[in-house]
């Protein structure tokens, strides 16, 4: 039998060095997510140089995104076993190596391996540990801190999109990749800022501590090859996994995970095909790149303002609803996109989509933290971003196949829009069902009285016991209001 004791090692400071952690995470999102978005600017160059179609070229962006999310649990494991600092520095070296090797590629397959697999693996070691570190330093102002940290994706896109286009024009796509390889080395600097912190947490402490101590001594004294040592090792591993990934059995987390699959499928293709779509409807190269910049700027506004708003007292308990609202509106934007075929119409689209994209991206770690708690946040975020992997991998090629097959972007954009709307509806429906179940207040009844039946609408209970009794007995005097049925 065990009892839970609170071991207060440190509380989230909600400031201090935490703001340096926010700055480090801000730079990590620039070097990972913003750079990943800007890879789509290379697509026209890749198609021309390698003479390939949309679906083949789109695999590069898909593999980068897929590896970043697929290996997110690996990033959590490395940061937990070694340190967040070591994991991010190692990831920066791998990502830079991928860009540099990609600049010497002679085929798309070389880009798949270097720019796709190697760079994506490096980004995975950096992204989820940096985001989880922000959650450990902030509690009361968590949404605002995440809003600032995640705004690096939008700011980086705004700055890097025209810069990358200029680099391609001046130094060709090979020179641009080489320069980006040097740029992402800044991830090593970001890793140096991630000072670890120990939070207060619940720990299960046995009432008879001498039993555990005796077991530990037996394990230490046993031979390394004895069955007792093997049993102790297996027990420690099982306990570690149960403590680290116990949230996987939570129903709320399972529903969130399923919803994330559809949301991730819908959100990725726009950053791949916005520039090619704009070019296909007659927008110039610089205007198409500027659309990505607008998307990035408004993404920043969505990150910060939604983070600040959901930290207010009036909305703090409705972060879940705000997340659903943002995802659904991005889906509606997708449905309208095929009707927007001029630059003046694509500008407000970029503003609207960018704002709500920044909004729900900010709230993903906040909603996850509310479900699993701060202690398991790093592992939970690793799983959440891992679930982005397959949708990120398949959605751009599927969209490219639809473009090649139908000759237009309409089917691809509609499919993405409906996927995001379904993601929002699924979470909302499950939340409503759970809320309805909670409002059904149980009332104690006597098993010996079969006539006593209670109906409830969540607030008022109605009894027909007296009416049933009156049928069997003589008419009773007028009952007082509020009489005791028992």
UniProtKB/Swiss-Prot annotation:
Residue ranges of coiled coil: none
Catalytic activity: creatine(in) = creatine(out); guanidinoacetate(in) = guanidinoacetate(out)
Alphabetized UniProt keyword annotations: Cell membrane, Membrane, Transmembrane, Transmembrane helix
Residues that span the membrane, as ranges: 10-30, 58-78, 86-106, 115-135, 148-168, 177-197, 253-273, 289-309, 320-340, 353-373, 383-403, 410-430
Keyword Cell membrane: yes
Ranges in the topological domain labelled Cytoplasmic: 1-9, 431-486
Subcellular location: Cell membrane; Basolateral cell membrane
Record-level GO cellular component terms: basolateral plasma membrane; plasma membrane
InterPro entries the record matches: MFS (IPR011701), MFS_dom (IPR020846), MFS_trans_sf (IPR036259), Proton-linked_MCT (IPR050327)
Membrane topology: Multi-pass membrane protein
Record text on activity regulation: Creatine uptake is inhibited by carbonyl cyanide 3-chlorophenylhydrazone (CCCP) and by valinomycin.
Family annotation (CDD domains): MFS_MCT12
Any one GO molecular-function label of the UniProt entry: creatine transmembrane transporter activity
Entry comment describing in which tissues the protein is expressed: Highly expressed in the lung, liver, kidney, and pancreas. Expressed in eye lens.
GO BP: any one term: creatinine metabolic process
Primary subcellular site in the record, as a coarse category: membrane
PANTHER family: MONOCARBOXYLATE TRANSPORTER, MONOCARBOXYLATE TRANSPORTER 12
Subunit structure: Interacts with isoform 2 of BSG; this interaction is required for its localization to the plasma membrane.
Function per UniProt: Functions as a transporter for creatine and as well for its precursor guanidinoacetate. Transport of creatine and GAA is independent of resting membrane potential and extracellular Na(+), Cl(-), or pH. Contributes to the process of creatine biosynthesis and distribution.
Family to which this protein belongs: Belongs to the major facilitator superfamily. Monocarboxylate porter (TC 2.A.1.13) family.
Name this protein carries in UniProt: Monocarboxylate transporter 12
Source organism per UniProt: Mus musculus (Mouse)
Taxonomic lineage of the native organism: Eukaryota, Metazoa, Chordata, Craniata, Vertebrata
Gene name in the database record: Slc16a12
């Amino acid at each position: 039998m065990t009892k839970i004791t609170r071991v207060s090692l440190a509380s989230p400071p909600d400031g201090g060095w935490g703001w340096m952690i926010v700055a480090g995470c801000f730079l990590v999102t620039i070097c990972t997510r913003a750079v990943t978005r800007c890879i789509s600017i290379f697509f026209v160059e890749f198609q021309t140089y390698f003479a390939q179609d949309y679906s083949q070229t789109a695999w590069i962006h898909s593999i980068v995104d897929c590896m970043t999310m697929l290996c997110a649990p690996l990033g959590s494991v490395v940061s937990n076993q070694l340190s967040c600092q070591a994991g991010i520095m190692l990831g920066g070296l791998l990502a830079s190596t991928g860009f540099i090797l990609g600049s010497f590629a002679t085929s798309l397959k070389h880009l798949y391996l270097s720019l796709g697999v190697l760079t994506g693996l490096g980004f995975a070691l950096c992204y989820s540990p940096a985001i989880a570190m922000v959650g450990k330093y902030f509690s009361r102002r968590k949404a605002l801190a995440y809003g600032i940290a995640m705004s690096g994706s939008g700011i980086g896109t705004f700055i890097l999109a025209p810069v990358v286009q200029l680099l391609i024009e001046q130094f060709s796509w090979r020179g641009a990749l080489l320069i980006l390889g040097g740029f992402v080395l800044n991830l090593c600097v970001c890793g140096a800022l991630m000072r670890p912190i120990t939070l207060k947490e619940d720990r299960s402490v046995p009432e008879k501590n001498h039993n555990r101590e005796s077991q530990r001594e037996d394990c230490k004294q046993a031979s390394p090859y004895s069955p007792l040592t093997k049993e102790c090792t297996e027990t420690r591993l099982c306990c570690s996994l149960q403590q680290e990934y116990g949230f996987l059995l939570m129903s709320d987390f399972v529903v969130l995970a399923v919803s994330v699959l559809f949301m991730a499928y819908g959100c990725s293709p726009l950053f791949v095909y916005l520039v090619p779509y704009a070019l296909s409807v007659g927008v110039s190269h610089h205007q198409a790149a500027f659309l990505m910049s607008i998307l990035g700027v408004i993404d920043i506004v969505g990150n910060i303002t939604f983070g600040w708003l959901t930290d207010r007292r009036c909305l703090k308990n409705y972060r879940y609803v705000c997340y659903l609202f943002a995802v659904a509106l991005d889906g509606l934007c997708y449905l309208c996109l095929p009707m927007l075929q001029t630059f003046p119409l694509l500008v407000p689209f970029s503003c609207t989509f960018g704002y709500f994209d920044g909004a729900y991206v900010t709230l993903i770690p906040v909603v996850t933290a509310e479900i699993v708690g701060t202690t398991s946040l790093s592992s939970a975020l690793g799983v959440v971003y891992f679930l982005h992997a397959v949708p990120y991998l398949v959605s751009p090629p599927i969209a490219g196949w639809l473009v090649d097959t139908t000759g237009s972007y309409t089917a691809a954009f509609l499919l993405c829009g409906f996927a995001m709307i379904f993601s929002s509806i699924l979470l909302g429906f499950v939340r409503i069902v759970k809320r309805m179940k909670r409002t059904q207040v149980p009332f104690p009844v006597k098993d010996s009285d079969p006539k006593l039946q209670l109906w409830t609408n969540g607030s008022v209970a109605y009894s027909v016991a007296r009416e049933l009794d009156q049928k069997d007995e003589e008419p009773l005097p007028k009952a007082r209001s509020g009489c005791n049925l028992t």
